[in-house]
Structure formats: C-alpha cells, structure tokens
C-alpha cells in the first residue's frame, strides 16, 4: 500500500501553477513507478491518496481534474482516494464533481485480510471553514456501524480520512480538549471515543491513517489504558509545491507499507528521488527552521 497526499493548486493555465501537476507527474509518480518496479514480480500493489487531490480556488476546472486523474492513474497500481477539504471547499458542486471523477466520499473495500474504510471527515460549518479535528455526521456514523457490522472480526481495519481526529485547534463544540501541557489549545474529535470503541472489536487490530497537515506525525493517545497511534502522513507536495520539504522538514514523498495477513510487516517513508535508506538528517545544534509558516510564493 502506498499512501500519498498530492495537493494541486492550479486554477487556470498559468504556467507557474501548472508546474504543480508537472512536478507530481515527473517526480512523485515517477518515483512511485520506480518503487513498484523494484518489488518482486507479481507483488500486488495498491495506493491510497489521503486527500486534497485538487484545489479549485473558486471555480471548477475540468482540465485540471482530468490531468490529476491521468497522473494518479499513470502507474499499474489500483488507487483509492479519500476526499480532502480542498477537494470540496464547502461547496456541493465541487463535492459532486469529485464523486463523478473519483468515486464516493464514504466507501470501503477489502485487500487480503485488511478492510479499508475511507470516510469524509471534513465537516464544513460556514463557507470554507471546517472543524479541526475532523468530525462525522450522524448519517456517516450509522453507515460506518453498518459497514463494520458486516466485516469479519478477525480482519484488520484501516480507517482512512483526511483531517486528524486526535488533534486540531478549530473544534466542534463537543470536541474534547487535550490534556497534555504541550497540546494546550488543541482538541480531539467528539467522535473519537465512539470510533475507537467500534474498531477495538477487531482481533486483527486497526490503524488510523490521515493527511491534511503537511507534516509527519504519529500522534499518541491513550484509550482505555492502551496507547493508540494516529498516523498523520506527510505530503507528496511538501509545503504545497513551493519547496522540497514539508513544514516539519520531512522531504516530499510517500509511505510504503507491506502486509502479511493482518500484520504490517514493514513500513518506511520514501522521500522522492531519495534512496529508501535515507530516513534522517541531522543538523548542528541551534540551527533554526521555521515549521509554522507556509513559504511565500
């Protein structure tokens, strides 16, 4: 499984902004193809986009949508996509067009002994404003309960969504404040306890996969005395195609997961055009990097 977070920003044919799609095609997808070709022949491979496949900036762009689909579909792997906030921006038209081009916003599928659930947790409440941490509507909770009720309990479940459920600073009124001192002002989703109670029944275990933040983070939470990790994936576009790194310093890239039955037998981050053995860079003490602001155009 290859989780990727693309993010495109071209609203027109501006040659500068067209480079977003070009970089994804000639860098990210080219690197993914190299990774796939390095695997033993016959290895089943599939991809997951963690959302933000496109950014419309106030107008639907059929040409951009087509270019993105072509890029995402240019390898031999089957790819599934979660819808992100920028794929819809609070507009029914954008969400409908995304469904026409990519598929439903809430769906599930099986691969081997793993059951994937992809769900739209971008809850818009005023124009383009959305809750962070992510939230679910009642109808989605009903659908999720029905889906999991039909799933064999010896499978592993991987819940895929865009906005983290375990931390955010633009909360819904029922979101729960985080109690750690370094997380002051941040919250967990009002649905988190319910989600974990539904997932805990699976003997094969479960994982939480998200994107959205443009930094890499395994956020640890305690649920009923157990440590639970939410895997927040860095973005293929880094700091929105304005550099070669995410805002935390993680290089543009994607993740590679290997499964044996219900177990993740291997996992590594693949920096674009870096060897997979490249996993860390050390800097001298007192070297400052600003990871809180987006780079200027």
Where are the regions a protein language model picked out?
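Short acidic, glycine-rich surface-loop motifs adjacent to enzyme active sites
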Residues: 148-175
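Short acidic, glycine/proline-rich loop/turn micro-motifs
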Residues: 10-15, 127-131, 170-173
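Extended active-site neighborhood of metal-dependent phosphoesterases/phosphodiesterases
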Residues: 56-153, 175-207, 215-259
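Short, well-ordered beta-to-alpha junction loops that form the rim of enzyme active sites
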Residues: 121, 160-165, 212-213, 269-270
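N-terminal active-site segment of His-dependent metallophosphoesterases
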Residues: 1-59
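Active-site glycine-centered loops adjacent to acidic/histidine catalytic or metal-binding residues
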Residues: 4, 51-52, 84-85, 162, ...
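A short C-terminal boundary segment appended to hydrolase-like catalytic domains
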Residues: 247-248, 255-297
């Amino acid at each position: 499984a290859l989780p990727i977070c693309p993010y495109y920003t071209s609203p027109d044919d501006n040659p500068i902004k067209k480079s977003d799609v070009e970089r994804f095609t000639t860098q990210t997808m080219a690197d993914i193809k190299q990774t796939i070709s390095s695997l033993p022949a016959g290895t089943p491979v599939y991809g997951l986009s963690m959302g933000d496949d496109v950014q419309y900036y106030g107008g639907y762009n059929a040409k951009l949508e087509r270019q993105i689909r072509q890029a995402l579909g240019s390898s031999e792997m089957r790819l599934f996509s979660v819808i992100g906030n920028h794929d819809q921006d609070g507009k029914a038209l954008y969400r409908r067009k995304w469904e026409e081009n990519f598929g439903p916003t809430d769906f599930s599928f099986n691969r081997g002994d793993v059951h994937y659930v992809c769900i739209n947790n971008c809850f818009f409440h005023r124009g383009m404003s959305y809750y962070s941490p992510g939230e679910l509507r009642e109808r989605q909770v009903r659908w999720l309960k029905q889906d999991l009720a039909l799933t064999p309990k010896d499978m592993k479940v991987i819940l895929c969504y865009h906005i983290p459920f375990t931390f955010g600073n633009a909360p819904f009124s029922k979101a729960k404040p985080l109690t750690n001192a370094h997380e002051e002002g941040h919250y967990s989703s009002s649905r988190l306890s319910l989600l974990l109670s539904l997932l805990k029944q699976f003997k094969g275990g479960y994982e939480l996969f998200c994107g959205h933040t443009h930094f890499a983070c395994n956020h640890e939470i305690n649920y009923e005395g157990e440590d639970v990790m939410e895997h927040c994936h860095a973005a293929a576009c880094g700091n929105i195609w304005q550099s070669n790194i995410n805002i935390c310093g993680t290089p543009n890239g994607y993740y590679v997961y290997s499964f044996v039955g219900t177990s993740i037998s291997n996992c590594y981050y693949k920096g674009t055009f870096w060897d997979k053995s490249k996993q860390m860079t050390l800097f001298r003490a007192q070297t400052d990097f600003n990871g809180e602001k987006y780079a200027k155009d």
